[in-house]
Regions:
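Extracellular leucine-rich repeat
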Residues: 2-439
Length: 439
């Protein structure tokens, strides 16, 4: 009987504590938490803006395993939003009109010991407009970063930095308005893929001190200016730069040490600066064990290119030119400029043959248009045509003159001999005088 008051008192304390408990994001009108402790937010017309915070009222609950946001007009991540969410594995953002990712808001490494065996975070952004990804916004233990079909207004320095255990970074069909230097800084990933979309300028050190252990790929991207030292990358097994449209490719734009072959294929480039391929090298250990690696330049169309633009690292690489289309009109002078490259490297280099309206290999053009006689061939043709025209004009002149002389001769019509057998004709030429009024 004495214990009854204590149980009543304890129940009252628990009830009061429950009443005083602050609401979490699960209690937000636009959000809910499911049985898997995932925070799922789908904004409506009444609740268009959402702010995710680490503490205080409507904070993300510490048991959250995923944060899934869809259809909001505006989403803001405050600093340290996910830092202490030890159970978190996924951050997914879809169809959001304005996203702001503040400093350290997606910095996540809740484990006391830094180890790649610890589970990591997966970050997905799809079909959204990201106003800004601040410096140091994404750090720590991250498995994958996938951003697709989105627009990024501002990407600050060190936005993605000091990451561990990264498997894949994939940027697909995005529009980058303003990228600042060293946006991706100092981490290791298995794969880095930049595919589709467009960027006004990829600045120097866009990727800085990044180690890619498997695949480095840039494919189908429209780039106005790819600056010098844009990609500072080490040790990928495979490098593929394919089907891109680049206005200007600066020298040493790809500063990459590879452990395997390098392919630069099906790209359209307006201007290639000197030394554009000089930054490609092969790792010293790989060269010592397997020999020089291949640098394949295959089926590219380039408007402004000089032989010095194809300078490469001969110590660690072997260059293979297979279908380089120079978007320039074929001339014997152009062919002479590339004669040395062809004799040294071999391969197929084409120029635009206007007379026939297609690309033709430089050796073929040399053989057909640039011999000792062929250089003066058109001069002979022009002179021959001129001589023929003059001869024709002279011939026409004499023919017309002869015809005119025939017309001036007197013509007499003789009567039939049967009728006028004894008729004599006397032709008297009289001088005609002017008539006077005396007649």
């Amino acid at each position: 009987m004495l214990l009854a008051p204590w149980w009543c008192l304890l129940a009252m304390v628990v009830r009061c504590a429950t009443q005083r408990a602050e609401p979490t994001a699960c209690d937000d009108d636009a959000c809910r938490c499911d049985s898997f402790t995932r925070l799922i937010c789908h904004c409506t017309d009444d609740y268009k803006e959402l702010t995710l915070r680490p503490d205080g009222a409507y904070r993300i609950p510490p048991t959250a395993t995923a944060i899934i946001i869809d259809g909001c007009d505006r989403l803001i991540f405050l600093p340290d939003t996910v830092r202490n969410l030890i159970h978190l594995r996924l951050v997914e953002i879809r169809n959001v009109s304005h996203v702001v990712v503040n400093e350290r808001s997606l910095a996540w490494n809740p484990f006391s010991r830094d180890s790649e065996t610890n589970p990591g975070l997966r970050i997905l952004i799809h079909n959204s407009t990201v106003n800004e990804i601040s410096s140091y916004a994404v750090q720590g233990r991250v498995d994958d970063i996938v951003i697709s079909d989105s627009r990024i207004n501002v990407l600050r320095p060190f936005a993605f930095s000091s990451l561990t255990g990264v498997k894949t970074i994939e940027l697909t069909n995005n529009i980058f308005d303003n990228i600042e230097i060293q946006s991706f800084k100092k981490f290791t990933t298995n794969n880095f893929i930049l595919r589709g979309g467009r960027a006004s300028t990829l600045p120097s050190r866009f990727l800085s001190d990044v180690e890619v252990t498997n695949l480095f790929r840039v494919e189908g991207v429209s780039i106005k200016h790819l600056s010098s030292l844009t990609f500072l990358v080490n040790l990928p097994k495979r490098i593929l730069v394919e089907s891109n449209s680049i206005d200007t490719l600066d020298g040493d734009g790809f500063h990459i040490s590879s452990r395997g072959p390098i392919t630069f294929r099906n790209n359209t480039v307006a201007t290639v600066r000197n030394g554009a391929f000089l930054g490609f090298t092969a790792d010293v250990e790989v060269v010592s064990l397997m020999g020089r690696q291949e640098l394949l330049i295959d089926n590219n169309t380039i408007t402004m290119l000089s032989p010095s633009s194809l300078t490469y690292n001969t110590t660690s690489l072997l260059l293979r030119l297979d279908g380089l289309n120079l978007n320039m009109t074929c001339t014997c002078q152009l062919a002479d400029e590339w004669r040395g490259v062809l004799s040294e490297q071999g391969g197929i280099i084409n120029c635009w043959y206007e007379l026939e309206g297609h690309y033709v290999s430089i050796p073929t053009y040399l053989d057909t248009r640039c011999g000792a006689f062929k250089n003066t061939f058109w001069i002979f043709v022009v002179v021959g045509v001129f001589v023929i025209m003059v001869a024709a004009a002279i011939a026409i002149y004499f023919i017309l003159r002869r015809e005119n002389e025939k017309k001036k001769k007197l013509q007499i019509v003789m009567p039939d001999g049967k009728t006028y057998r004894e008729t004599e004709f006397h032709i008297v030429v009289e001088r005609a005088e002017l008539l006077t009024t005396d007649l």
